[in-house]
């Protein structure tokens, strides 16, 4: 994503490029892949992340994390920061009133991501994240930036 901050430029990246994985696979596929990678990709060397389904999502510092991201240039509003926990709960609950969330994040998806509607888990959070990767890219804006760079001889 355009707001990712790699810990070290040029560091080795292991695994597939997930930049555009959003929407390519179902939530159930992602959950199965995270629980037992070789059951869906036999040659996978990825370790299992089944524990994510059993780990409740820690909501205690969500606002602080968004505030820190805002400090390094991610365009979160004060309302985004104040409502971080409410937004996370609403996004993972298909029965919640998510009108305010959808107004601020029009491309957000609202549903139970991990197949366990009774709990908000780290699996919900990771699958929701994977499902959004690459879906918010404005290809026209990116192309316009490339055209501008070419015009300026870069």
Regions found by a protein language model. Give the residues of each.
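Periplasmic c-type cytochrome electron-transfer domains
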Residues: 1-154
């Amino acid at each position: 994503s355009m707001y990712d901050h790699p810990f070290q430029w040029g560091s080795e990246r292991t695994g597939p490029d997930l930049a555009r994985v959003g929407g390519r696979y179902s939530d159930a596929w992602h959950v199965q892949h995270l629980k037992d990678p070789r059951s869906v990709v036999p040659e996978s060397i990825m370790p299992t992340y089944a524990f994510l389904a059993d780990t409740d999502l820690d909501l205690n510092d969500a606002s602080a994390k968004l505030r820190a991201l805002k400090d390094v240039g991610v365009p979160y509003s004060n309302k985004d920061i104040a409502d971080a926990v409410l937004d996370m709960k609403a996004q993972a609950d298909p029965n919640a009133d998510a009108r305010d969330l959808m107004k601020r994040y029009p491309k957000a998806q609202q549903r139970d991501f991990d197949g366990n509607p009774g709990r908000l888990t780290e699996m919900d959070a990771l699958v929701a994240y994977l499902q959004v990767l690459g879906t918010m890219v404005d290809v026209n804006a990116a192309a316009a930036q490339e055209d501008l760079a070419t015009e300026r001889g870069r």
